[in-house]
């Protein structure tokens, strides 16, 4: 066992990694020669390739191998050099797939490039054809120009052609000059066309600006509801708890009326625009007719003057024949002149009538716009006064006092606001209100109030004498209304009594027995 352990230790010592210094632990054994202290200096040793470190350590620095082949065989034999370090997840199959995908992409790119080259070739072929066509056209134009040349030049060219069958450079230069002349003419025509197009564009812009101005004027004229809404939003009133539901109802009705007015304004704007366009077209047609008539008149006058000028020359008179005498010819010419003048006068009259009609249509449209503006201003003023009176806040609002929308005459689809929450009575009540409550029944009070609300704005400050006069004039008893409302309400019988100079109706719920017996 001891021998095996010694061999194993020796094997481990011999099997140290070559190329690295071997460190040995030197232990002093008793009875050996080296039992004493080491006299050699540190770093110096008798054995070559061994270096001492301290008293107990030695480092082996001798060459590990005698040749390169020994080192190769020691480390596992020969192998190929790898230029770069691959990843741990490297796999040959994955690399093949990747290369295949790359090859497929390259093929696709090649196909795309081939298609592009084909398109380029087709474009080149088309350009070549166009160039050939242009050359043919130039040759044809040159031939046409050569036909228009003088006879002397043609003879010279023919003689030169007899001598030289090939085309001469003079001919080519002439053709080129003619082509340049034609190009210059076409360029001039293009410039004229461009100038006309620019002038037309300017006219169109002017017409558009005019239309925008008219639209702005019309919208400013019909901008009533928007201004009313803005004024309502600007009004600031102290908070009143009792008038909140009424304000909400008024706002809802005002919004609905504004929508109706907006629709009416849009329709009126469209009709006005259509009329303006029609009037402009009529004016243009009238101007064109006038221009044509003036041109015809000038032509006829110029023809007459030319005939007068021609009459100054002396031509030999043709032989007279019994079939076409000279007088008949003069009469025919005079009749044709008269008919042409009559036609021109008719055209002028028609043009003037068209202009008058267009002016009348424009005046009617302007009058309608003015009427609409006046109505709008009146509605705004009335609505402002109504809002001021309604938002002042009275001390008392009578029972069964109903409010109706101011725009009920404009928007008929809305129902009257008779089913509204009634406001609560306040503590301070005037003498006028007390007398009205005690002396006048409900039916007699509500009817004149509704009439006054429908006709005009309700009056707030009324004297006692005025109230009594109104009671004398307006209080009436309607028997038919009582018969119709028997199943809903109790019957109230009014009896007229005299208190001095005042006639007051007092309601009596029960009839006296004496009257019933009678």
From Swiss-Prot:
Q: Any idea which UniProt keywords this protein has?
A: Coiled coil
Top-rank taxon: Eukaryota
Q: Which residues form a coiled coil?
A: 95-141, 188-219, 344-375
On whether Coiled coil is a keyword of this UniProt record, the answer is yes
Q: Does the keyword Coiled coil apply?
A: yes
| Basic and acidic residues: bias regions | 328-337
Segments for region (Disordered): 303-337
Query: Signal sequence: where?
Result: none
Query: Which family does this protein fall into?
Result: Belongs to the WEB family.
Q: What is this protein called?
A: WEB family protein At2g40480
Organism of origin: Arabidopsis thaliana
């Amino acid at each position: 066992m001891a021998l095996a352990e010694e061999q194993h230790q020796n094997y481990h010592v011999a099997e140290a990694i070559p190329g690295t210094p071997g460190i040995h632990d030197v232990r002093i054994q008793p009875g050996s020669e080296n039992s004493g202290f080491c006299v050699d200096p540190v770093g110096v040793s008798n054995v070559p390739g061994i270096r001492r470190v301290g008293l107990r350590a030695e480092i082996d620095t001798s060459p590990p191998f005698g040749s390169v082949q020994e080192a190769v065989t020691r480390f596992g034999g020969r192998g190929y050099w790898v230029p770069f370090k691959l990843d741990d997840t490297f796999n040959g199959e994955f690399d093949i797939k990747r290369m295949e995908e790359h090859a497929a992409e390259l093929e696709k790119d090649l196909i795309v490039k081939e298609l592009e080259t084909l398109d380029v070739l087709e474009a080149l072929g088309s350009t070549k054809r166009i160039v050939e066509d242009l050359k043919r056209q130039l040759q044809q134009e040159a031939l046409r120009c050569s036909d228009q040349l003088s006879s002397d030049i043609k003879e010279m060219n023919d003689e030169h052609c007899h001598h030289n069958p090939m085309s001469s450079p003079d001919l080519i230069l002439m053709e080129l000059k003619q082509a340049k002349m034609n190009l210059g003419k076409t360029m001039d025509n293009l410039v004229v066309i461009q100038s006309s197009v620019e002038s037309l564009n300017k006219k169109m812009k002017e017409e558009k600006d005019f239309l925008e101005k008219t639209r702005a004027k019309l919208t400013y004229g019909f901008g009533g509801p928007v201004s009313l809404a803005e004024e309502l939003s600007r009004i600031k009133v102290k908070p009143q708890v009792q008038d909140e539901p009424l304000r909400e109802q008024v706002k809802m009705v005002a919004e609905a009326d504004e929508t109706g007015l907006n629709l009416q304004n849009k329709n009126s704007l469209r009709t006005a625009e259509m009329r303006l366009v029609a009037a402009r077209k009529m004016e243009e047609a009238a101007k064109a007719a006038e221009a044509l008539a003036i041109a015809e008149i000038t032509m006829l006058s110029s023809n007459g003057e030319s005939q007068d000028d021609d009459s100054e020359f002396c031509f030999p008179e043709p032989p007279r024949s019994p079939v076409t005498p000279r007088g008949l010819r003069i009469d025919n010419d005079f009749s044709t002149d008269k008919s042409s003048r009559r036609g021109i006068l008719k055209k002028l009259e028609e043009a003037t009538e068209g202009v008058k009609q267009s002016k009348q249509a424009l005046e009617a449209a302007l009058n309608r716009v003015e009427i609409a503006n006046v109505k709008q201003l009146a509605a705004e003023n009335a609505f402002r006064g109504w809002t001021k009176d309604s938002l002042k806040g009275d001390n008392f609002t009578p029972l069964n006092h109903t409010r109706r929308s101011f725009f009920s005459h404009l928007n008929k689809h809305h129902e009257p606001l008779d089913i509204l929450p009634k406001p609560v009575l306040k503590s301070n009540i005037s003498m006028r209100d007390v007398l009205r409550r005690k002396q006048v029944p409900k039916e007699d009070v509500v009817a004149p109030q509704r009439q006054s609300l429908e006709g005009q704005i309700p009056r707030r400050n009324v004297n006692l004498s005025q109230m009594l006069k109104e009671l004398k004039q307006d209080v009436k008893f309607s028997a038919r209304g009582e018969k119709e409302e028997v199943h809903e309400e109790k019957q109230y019988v009014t009896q007229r009594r005299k208190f001095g100079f005042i006639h007051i109706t007092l309601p009596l719920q029960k009839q006296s027995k004496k009257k019933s017996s009678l």
